[in-house]
């Protein structure tokens, strides 16, 4: 069926030497489970976006992101593509990086980001008084003319439940979609 050095998916297992203690094996397996747990936290849309990003980075189409892929990407973005810069990018993971390793690494990184704080910060740029409220006209304009533009029906469906007296209560909206501040 599969060799003892491969799992059921055909992925290579890290061989343990005869000097490896059982506690070292358990620690290594726990670390592996923790990192794959980050991958499990990704939504299907995040996975799809990350797959698309992976495909863009995999310039030669070999199913792996290597040093040359990163160098090509950095050069095309007019960024520092020196060996030092590339080495820095690969400090925590060894190239080449396959899709599973990329998703796990990105999942781990995304888990450390606080979506609640990021959303509050984004909304606060429209809140001159830092009151947790934004004039509804400002929100309509921003949602229909900036970034991923929304049509009027989409704008109204988002704003409807969090609007009163001509203002959008963005803190309540953020609490609803990213969890309240008490849960973070």
Curated annotation (Swiss-Prot):
Q: Name one GO molecular function term.
A: cytoskeletal motor regulator activity
**Main location (coarse class):** cytoplasm
Please give the SUPFAM superfamilies that the UniProt record associates with this protein.
EF-hand
- Record-linked InterPro entries: EF-hand-dom_pair, EF_Hand_1_Ca_BS, EF_hand_dom, Myosin_RLC
Gene Ontology cellular component terms for the protein in this record? cytoplasm; cytosol; medial cortical node; mitotic actomyosin contractile ring; mitotic actomyosin contractile ring, distal actin filament layer; myosin II complex; nucleus
Enumerate the residues binding Ca(2+).
58, 60, 62, 64, 69
Q: Which CDD domains match?
A: EFh (cd00051)
Which residue positions does Phosphoserine occur at? 36
Q: Which Pfam families does the UniProt record give? A: EF-hand_7
Q: Where is this region: Disordered?
A: 1-29
Segments forming domain EF-hand:
45-80, 114-149
Q: Which cell locations does it reside in?
A: Cytoplasm
Q: Which UniProt keywords apply?
A: Calcium, Cytoplasm, Metal-binding, Motor protein, Myosin, Phosphoprotein, Repeat
Does this UniProt record's set of keywords contain Metal-binding? Answer: yes
Q: What else is known?
A: This chain binds calcium.
What is the official name of this protein in its record? Myosin regulatory light chain 1
Q: In the UniProt record, what gene is named as encoding this protein? A: rlc1
